[in-house]
């Protein structure tokens, strides 16, 4: 059993400036165990209001390629304008051990759809002291890490849409795909960021397919007078046969327009891998 002081850095504005009051400090109690080359750690996050009571929550980390990685999916809140919106949140924590016993890494939080997202620096320092009687769960009792087919979506992909009726292709965009999966291997989140502007959309993997729901938006009718509210979602089945990394995904983009010129449109959508 070991104890860590955890410093989570501030969130940032779109231009990279830190947001005042968003940094925080936590206390973690952790345990780890290795079976051969497979190592797993459990963490209990201490409740600052009751350090001797039940933890706020627990986490499980796996040691992969030199880093400790934790992926968690849970209902969450995202502030859109002045409104708190219910969302499905994904938290990814990646930690790299340092020679002095500390750890440095990144704390990433994103929602699906991508209404909110941020990335912070995180630093763990070994600590000692009394007043904490919380224990982390026994890591030896954790089920083994399962392989995740969705993890194969990684690298740079060109995203393109084609209008079925006319063959018109809309301007393509390149995205860097970084995918993180739950320990069960059945669900994953893919963070798709544009190469030049770091704009983000979020894809989810589950039940053998990738999906993406995009934030609603307002648009003008083609007559330039009326207005509609647009919703859009993509559905892309996992390709047949093993691919690692995934070379291409093809599927359908479903778009609906509600308002003065209502319509439902289906587009062919494709993600084509073009690099690492």
Predicted segments with their positions:
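Beta-strand-enriched cores of mature, soluble protein domains
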Residues: 30, 88-91, 103-108, 118, ...
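Edge beta-strand at a domain terminus
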Residues: 108-149, 252-276
């Amino acid at each position: 059993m070991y104890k860590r002081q955890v410093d989570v850095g501030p969130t940032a504005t779109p231009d990279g400036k830190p947001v005042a009051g968003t940094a925080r400090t936590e206390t973690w109690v952790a345990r780890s165990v290795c079976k051969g080359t497979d190592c797993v750690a459990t963490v209990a996050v201490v409740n600052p209001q009751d350090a001797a009571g039940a933890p706020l929550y627990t986490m499980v980390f796996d040691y992969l390629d030199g880093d400790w990685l934790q992926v968690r999916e849970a209902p969450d809140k995202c502030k859109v304008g002045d409104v708190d919106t219910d969302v499905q949140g994904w938290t990814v924590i990646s930690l790299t051990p340092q020679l002095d016993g500390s750890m440095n890494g990144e704390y990433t939080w994103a929602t699906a759809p991508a209404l909110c997202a941020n990335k912070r620096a995180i630093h763990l320092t070994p600590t000692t002291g009394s007043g904490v009687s919380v224990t982390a769960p026994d890591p030896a009792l954790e089920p083994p890490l399962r392989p995740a087919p969705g993890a194969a979506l990684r690298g740079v992909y060109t995203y393109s849409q084609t209008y079925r009726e006319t063959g018109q292709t809309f301007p393509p965009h390149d995205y860097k795909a970084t995918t993180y999966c739950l320990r069960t291997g059945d669900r994953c989140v893919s963070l798709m960021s544009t190469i030049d502007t770091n704009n983000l959309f979020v894809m989810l993997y589950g039940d053998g397919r990738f999906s993406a729901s995009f934030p609603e938006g307002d648009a003008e009718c083609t007559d330039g007078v009326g207005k509609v509210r647009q919703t859009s979602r993509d559905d892309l089945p996992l390709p047949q046969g093993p691919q690692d990394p995934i070379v291409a995904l093809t599927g359908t983009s479903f778009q609906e327009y509600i308002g003065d010129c209502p319509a439902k449109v289906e587009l062919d959508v494709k993600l084509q891998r073009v690099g690492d």
